[in-house]
A protein has these predicted regions:
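Active-site nucleotide/adenylate-binding loops and adjacent lid/helix of ATP-dependent enzymes
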Residues: 2-8, 12-13, 19-20, 90, ...
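Conserved N-proximal alpha/beta basic substrate-recognition cap immediately N-terminal to
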Residues: 14-15, 19-23, 31, 37-158
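A short, N-terminal amphipathic alpha-helix
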Residues: 24-35, 204, 208-209
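Residues at the C-termini of beta-strands that transition into short coil/loop
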Residues: 40-42, 129, 157-160, 197, ...
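Glycine-rich phosphate/pyrophosphate-binding beta-alpha loops
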Residues: 105-106, 190, 248-253
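Short small-residue beta-strand/loop micro-motif enriched in glycine and branched aliphatics
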Residues: 126-127, 189-190, 267-270
Length: 276
């Protein structure tokens, strides 16, 4: 059996979404091949080994259980191997893990920080590496790389907390005027994202985004098609791609996946997509 450390929860605003994702991953694991080792991370960033009822993961009730604290110890050499340790009865003991599967969303999970920690500790992990994770989490960096590669994308300007009113107005002009989208530069799941049609909405949008990140992306409003495609593999073992899906958005004009009760209320998912 392969012991898979499933990391879930986390410190970001997408904590609850991570719980839902972890619940899906746990259910999908082949129990004949993989043994899940559940590592829950609370909103304060503390790590715990959870061994209770799996149903309590998605609800968040796992935190009410008596969980053993977990730490990561650096070391990747054969004679100085690092990894996971759990605190049991006042003593640290090794938590046997063959590979880690981070099922974390947002900052502290998808931004390369956890990936870097796992690499320093010599723990193999599933998913993007440090650089790809960091670049994909930062909208400014991803826009710049796309532009450098010749990929067309909306105009994107960056503001930092404390920017002057003149700077705030200037980036709107650089994006072609209203409407614009305002986003935490390193957030996800549309949390803190607003569409601003005028100066009043723009002020509120900036306040909402700056409450979540000191760096904010202001983007040109475009009419396009939103598509998604899962990619599995790497340059060594080859790459497999799934079907391309298409998200058709109605109503307020963008996909609000973070809505808890009905995240798809304003959307229609087509798979495969109906692209020409």
């Amino acid at each position: 059996m392969i012991n898979v450390a499933i990391l879930f929860g986390g410190i970001s605003t997408e904590h609850d979404i991570s719980l839902k994702s972890a619940d899906n991953v746990i259910a999908a694991l082949d129990s004949k091949r993989f043994c899940p080792v559940l590592i829950g991370i609370d909103r304060n960033g503390s790590w715990f080994h959870y061994t209770g009822d799996l149903a309590d993961v998605v609800t968040g009730a796992w935190e009410e259980h008596d969980c053993a604290p977990v730490v990561l110890i650096p070391g990747s050499a054969p004679d100085a191997r690092g990894g996971f340790l759990e605190l049991v009865d006042g003593e640290f003991r090794e938590l046997e893990v063959d590979v880690a599967l981070p099922v974390l969303h947002g900052q502290g999970g998808e931004d390369g920080t956890v990936q870097g920690a796992l690499e320093v500790c010599g723990v193999p992990y599933v998913g993007c590496g440090v650089l790809a994770s960091a670049v994909c989490m930062d909208k400014d960096a991803s826009h710049r790389l796309a532009a450098a590669a010749g990929v067309r994308s909306p105009k994107c300007e960056v503001l930092y907390r404390g920017a002057t009113a003149e700077d705030e107005a200037a980036v709107v002009e650089k994006c072609g005027g209203y409407p614009v989208f305002v986003k935490p530069a390193r957030g996800g799941s549309s949390i803190g994202v607003s569409k601003a049609n005028d100066a009043d909405e723009y002020r509120k949008a900036l306040d909402a985004a700056f409450a979540l990140d000191e760096k904010v992306a202001v983007e040109e409003n475009i009419t396009g098609v939103e598509v998604g495609c899962a990619v599995v593999g790497d340059a060594v073992h080859g790459v497999r791609m799934g079907e391309v899906d298409e998200i058709v958005v109605h109503g307020d004009g963008f996909f609000r996946i973070h809505l808890e009760k009905d995240p798809g209320a304003n959307t229609e998912l087509r798979c495969p997509s109906e692209l020409p």
